[in-house]
Design a protein with these regions (language model features):
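Extracellular "leader-to-stem" segments immediately downstream of a signal peptide or signal-anchor
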Residues: 2-14, 19-120, 127-193, 198-200, ...
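Internal metal/ion-chelating core segments
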Residues: 202-260
Length: 260
């Protein structure tokens, strides 16, 4: 299938957000519906059920105070995520590098960014969500990007290809591991409960720990992951440079479709 499938609405939001009045209906799961590859006799993996996306339910993090000059944008990004109505909507991360994840800016005790049901988190081309450095990000086990109150459904985390990046700045964490420092990094993306998740068309690199975790004891199901590049240094690269415990995709629930 073609990579970097970009819906008209997402492109409009990134490149011409002020002119969003003529936005089209979000139709971004058509390709996924055709690519499920479900074996005969098996139930298909369900895809997110999303509302029509318009200017009224699209939220750019810059409008909530996020800045590429800021040391931390956690609170601004969370405000945009919280602004999504119960009926659903989309949060846009524009081009640029956006720091997040310092412990002092956390708005939750267990998650840094919390996404609620029926939300699309869209990283534009050239957008990087970069985790705060070791010693500033929490050393205790937290979820960096997860579901609000753990149980949410119909969530999309997407980009526009390999220039849409989530960067964990893991090198200092890995060195600390070799130096026997005490810390317990969580997953970069953890969808713990609920159902109908879609992660696609982006790159995750240099995470302190696991890249993506689906479910906790079977409590989450129906996840689709495709065209996601996961990049971590190999363990054989040598002392001070190798990544540690950076599993790609940990699956602990049923009905998960991973391809390309």
């Amino acid at each position: 299938m073609n990579k970097s499938i970009i819906t008209t609405i997402a492109l409009s939001a990134c490149l011409a957000f002020p002119m969003f009045a003529d936005a089209q209906t979000f139709t971004g799961i058509t390709a996924e519906q055709k690519a499920q590859n479900t074996p005969e006799g098996w139930p298909a993996v369900s895809l997110p059920q999303l509302p029509e996306i318009t200017a009224a339910n699209t939220f750019n993090i810059k409008d909530y105070g996020a800045s590429t000059d800021a040391e931390d944008n956690t609170k601004a990004i969370q405000k945009a995520l919280d602004a999504v109505p119960d009926a659903g909507g989309m949060v846009v991360i524009p081009e640029g590098t956006w720091m997040f994840g310092s412990e002092k800016e956390m708005t939750s005790t267990s998650e840094i960014l919390s996404i609620k049901s029926k939300t699309i988190l869209h990283l534009c081309a050239g957008a990087t969500l970069k985790l705060a450095p070791y010693g500033t990000a929490p050393l205790k086990k937290v979820v960096y990007i997860g579901c609000k109150n753990k149980k949410q459904s119909d969530i999309v985390i997407e980009g526009e290809g390999e220039t849409s990046i989530i960067d964990g700045q893991g090198a200092r964490w890995w060195l600390a591991k070799e130096q026997k420092d005490t810390f317990d990094p969580g997953s970069m993306i953890r969808l713990e409960q609920g159902q109908r998740f879609l992660i696609r068309n982006l790159k995750i690199q240099n995470t302190p720990g696991v890249n993506i975790t689906i479910s906790n004891g079977g409590k989450a199901s129906h996840a689709t992951i495709h065209d996601v590049v996961i990049s971590e240094p190999a363990s054989e690269i040598g002392a001070g440079k190798a990544s540690h415990n950076t599993d790609g995709i940990a699956i602990w629930g049923p009905y998960v479709n991973i391809y390309d």
